């Protein structure tokens, strides 16, 4: 049997082609200490700050401290089963979260994993949780209103799309209720809402999910939840994950509203991590860069220019104060980062004024440019009149005799305060707010008893809706109170008032 050399050569070549040896180099290290959700790893010579690390048992970690002879990491999962001597591998990338339309209506954790039992999230797109904020050139000014549906806010402290408005107040003053109402008010307005729960009770988050589902708001909402049961690193990552999910929609030219509830607990989670990593503590034991963790998060809220799609990300961070002290470290930090704040006060809340907005020290630095003209026309003097009322009310407590003009102002102030009260889960369309506030500011309520104002408001809106339906539509479309609209509105108010007073 003759075997030709060519045949042997071809057989050898085929065999060599089959044999592929790939060498894969992985940056790795050894755990030298683990506990309290923190680990120190020896090795990882090419590790980067914020890099995603692979621990045993399918647990991931994040490198935060790059020291001379070891790397300080935080674990993004359960540390059970991880021990000294285990191998840790570097991934060469930072933490990413899944993004896309598939997340709408879902409840996810800080890593974008589902928590609602509705099955896996079908998306193959991911986005890093740390992204550089849009530059000045990429932005446009805030010029479109984001209606909250709350009279006290849309009239005096208007919020624009792309703004960062802080909601600050003690515990149990209605901060979360206020943002939930704002989310409910976005129904049908083509705004995607993201609610980030940081360090809250699981029962609270479940209640919010149920409320949004019942009201039909989960159709355009996403909830990112990192509850008190989660480790500090997961609580720390939650707002950045929520922000990345929101930025995906913003870059597509959509409007997004994101709520961080709340950044006080976020700062506490970061302080916990930093102290466990042996970083030097500063004021109130917070690390020196606690300002930076919030500023880099909130700077990502923006109104993009038309060339970049014109999308927006509006941020409503929440801060919880202790005994109304807004001069503490974290409150002052976040006040200085945001474009204004809505201050909720316990005293107002307990006296029955809800939402308990203190109009005196609440401010919106950029929202005024976004407010519709009709609302500006109506509420030009509202803040001043409320301030004068408070001053007079304090003066009247001493039992001093007031002149006729002061008494008139006092009575009007009482009615203005009453008209700004609003029930929870009942946001109002902006045209209805304009009608009600026009009635109050222009002294149409002077002969209505204070206790009848709520009833008057409800029935007036029903009357206008039945007999003057085109009036609300005109205000909504033209966004300005022309002389013709004012005349029609005054006729409607006078007609209804006559009926109301006869019934009373």
Curated annotation (Swiss-Prot):
UniProt main location, coarse: membrane
InterPro entries: ATP_synth_asu-like_sf, ATP_synth_asu_C, ATP_synth_asu_C_sf, ATP_synth_F1_a_nt-bd_dom, ATP_synth_F1_asu, ATPase_a/bsu_AS, ATPase_F1/V1/A1_a/bsu_N, ATPase_F1/V1/A1_a/bsu_N_sf
Annotated catalysed reactions: ATP + H2O + 4 H(+)(in) = ADP + phosphate + 5 H(+)(out)
Stated name of the protein: ATP synthase subunit alpha
Enzyme category, top tier: translocase
Family listed: Belongs to the ATPase alpha/beta chains family.
UniProt keyword annotation of Hydrolase present: no
Site entry (Required for activity), positions: 362
Residues at which ATP binds: 169-176
Assembly and binders: F-type ATPases have 2 components, CF(1) - the catalytic core - and CF(0) - the membrane proton channel. CF(1) has five subunits: alpha(3), beta(3), gamma(1), delta(1), epsilon(1). CF(0) has three main subunits: a(1), b(2) and c(9-12). The alpha and beta chains form an alternating ring which encloses part of the gamma chain. CF(1) is attached to CF(0) by a central stalk formed by the gamma and epsilon chains, while a peripheral stalk is formed by the delta and b chains.
Catalytic activity, EC: 7.1.2.2
């Amino acid at each position: 049997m003759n075997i030709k050399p060519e045949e042997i050569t071809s057989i050898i070549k085929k065999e060599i082609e089959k044999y592929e040896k790939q060498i894969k180099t992985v940056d790795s290290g050894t755990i030298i200490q683990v506990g309290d959700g923190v680990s120190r790893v020896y090795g990882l010579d090419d590790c980067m700050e914020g890099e995603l690390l692979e621990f045993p048992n399918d647990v991931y970690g994040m490198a935060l401290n790059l020291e001379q002879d070891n790397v300080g990491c935080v674990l993004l999962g359960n540390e059970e089963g991880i021990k000294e001597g285990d191998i840790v591998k570097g991934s060469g990338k930072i933490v990413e979260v899944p993004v896309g339309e598939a997340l709408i209506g879902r409840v996810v954790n800080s890593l974008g994993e589902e928590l609602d039992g509705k099955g896996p999230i079908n998306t193959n797109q991911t986005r890093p949780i740390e992204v550089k904020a849009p530059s000045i050139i990429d932005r446009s000014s805030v010029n479109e209103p984001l209606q909250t549906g709350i009279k006290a806010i849309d009239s005096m402290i208007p919020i624009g799309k792309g703004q960062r408005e802080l909601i600050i107040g003690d515990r149990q003053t209605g901060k979360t209720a206020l943002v939930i109402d704002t989310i409910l008010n976005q129904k049908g307005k083509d705004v995607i809402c993201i609610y980030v729960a940081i360090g809250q009770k699981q029962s609270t988050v479940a209640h919010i999910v149920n409320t949004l589902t019942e009201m039909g708001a989960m159709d355009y909402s996403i909830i990112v939840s990192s509850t008190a049961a989660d480790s500090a690193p997961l609580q720390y990552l939650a707002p950045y994950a929520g922000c990345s999910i929101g930025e995906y929609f913003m870059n597509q030219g959509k409007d997004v509203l994101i709520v961080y509830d709340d950044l006080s607990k976020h700062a506490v989670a970061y302080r916990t991590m930093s102290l466990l990593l042996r970083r030097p503590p500063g004021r109130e034991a917070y690390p020196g860069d606690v300002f930076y963790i919030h500023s880099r998060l909130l700077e990502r809220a923006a109104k993009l220019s038309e060339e970049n799609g014109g999308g927006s990300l509006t941020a409503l961070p929440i801060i919880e104060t202790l005994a109304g002290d807004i001069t503490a470290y974290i409150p002052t930090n976040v006040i200085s980062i945001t474009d204004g704040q809505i201050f909720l006060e316990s005293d107002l809340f307990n006296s029955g004024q809800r939402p308990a907005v203190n109009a005196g020290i609440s401010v919106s630095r950029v929202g005024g440019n976004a407010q519709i003209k009709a609302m500006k026309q109506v509420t030009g003097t509202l803040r001043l009149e409320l301030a004068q009322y408070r001053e007079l009310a304090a003066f009247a407590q001493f039992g001093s005799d007031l002149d006729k003009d002061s008494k008139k102002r006092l009575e009007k102030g009482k009615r203005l305060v009453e008209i700004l009260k609003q029930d929870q889960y009942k946001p109002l369309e902006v045209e209805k707010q304009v009608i009600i506030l026009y009635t109050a500011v222009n002294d149409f309520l002077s002969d209505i008893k204070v206790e009848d104002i709520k009833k008057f408001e409800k029935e007036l809106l029903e009357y206008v809706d039945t007999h003057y339906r085109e009036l609300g539509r005109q205000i909504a479309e033209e966004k300005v109170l022309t002389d013709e609209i004012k005349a029609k509105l005054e006729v409607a108010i006078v007609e209804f008032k006559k009926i109301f007073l006869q019934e009373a």
